[in-house]
Amino acid sequence: MAAAVRCLRRVLIHHQRHCLCKMASQASLYPCSVNSLLHNRHFAAAAAAATKPARKIKKGAKEKTSDEKPVDDIEKIKSYTYMESDPEDDVYLKRLYPRRIYEVEKAIHLLKKFQVLDFTNPKQGVYLDLTLDMALGKKKTVEPFASVIALPHLFSSEVNKVAVFTANASEIKIAEENGAAFAGGTDLVKKIMDDEVVVDFYVAVPEIMGELNPLRKKLKKRFPKATRNSIGRDIPKMLELFKTAHEIMVDEERQNFLSTKIATLDMPSDQIAANLQAVINEVCKHRPLNLGPFVVRAFLRSSTSEGLLLKTDSLLPKEAKTTEAETEETQTAEAA
């Protein structure tokens, strides 16, 4: 056992001497000065960086960078000058020509032509997209509205479901005889609150309006209002309007955009134009004419085509100009 321990000790001592000799031979390859400073090299680099003079920045360059403004993404787009003549072919670069503006009759003709060339449904819908100027002045705006109109030419054979609010038994009978889907008083209110009754439009007689307050939040813009002709005593007349009525409504998210279907593409062009004019006339009632054009842009499109920009000057109602004689008559009447 002692012999084995002595043998192991000799091996370890020999190995230690061999390692020390190898390290000494490697260290002798470098000068003494390098060997002494090699392990402190990072301190020398830090000292050199501290003593190095700071880079001088020209005053003009500094002012230039401070005056620079961020370039807008729109300015990065290369602008092209428009061509003087109209495109000679149907295929052309849009950026080289201003957007074309069409009369209503020409736009309808093109939509019918697109349908034939594209082999699409001839009975597809025709839509009118309006961008509105909702400003009233002095930080006031037009509230998003909903209206009901009777189009000159119907494009749908479906009859709207109409509910009539009245507590009078004879009026309930009249409503049912004239095509009302539902008619009643507080019992009808409860059914609507429980979602048992859902219809397209709601009309009411003035006497029952106080009992309809629970429905105000539920019906929202379809709640009966005098401005929408949904409150009155002539029940047959209201039903005649709302059974075939067309509803137009401003988009609640965009606040100034209105899109509505006005016809089908297989209808005669004059009927499509008449429906378009009826919608614009109704829209323009929601803002005084003396504030300028209410419709900023109008596009006509079909279900499968692009929108065609319309000339709106001839479509918008004009403010009535009063003559001097009419003004004098008005002032005289007011004084009397």
UniProtKB/Swiss-Prot annotation:
Residue span of the annotated presequence: 1-50
Pfam families found in the cross-reference section: Ribosomal_L1
Keyword Transmembrane: no
Keywords, sorted A to Z: Mitochondrion, Phosphoprotein, Ribonucleoprotein, Ribosomal protein, Transit peptide
A GO BP annotation: mitochondrial translation
Gene3D superfamilies: 3.30.190.20, 3.40.50.790
GO molecular function: RNA binding; structural constituent of ribosome
InterPro entries given in the database record: Ribosomal_uL1-like (IPR023674), Ribosomal_uL1/biogenesis (IPR028364), Ribosomal_uL1_3-a/b-sand (IPR016095), Ribosomal_uL1_mit (IPR005879)
Modification sites for Phosphoserine: S85
Domain of life: Eukaryota
SUPFAM superfamilies, per database record: Ribosomal protein L1 (SSF56808)
Cell location: Mitochondrion
Record's GO cellular component terms: mitochondrial inner membrane; mitochondrial large ribosomal subunit; mitochondrion
Family: Belongs to the universal ribosomal protein uL1 family.
Name used for this protein in its record: Large ribosomal subunit protein uL1m
Source organism of this protein record: Mus musculus
Lineage: Eukaryota, Metazoa, Chordata, Craniata, Vertebrata
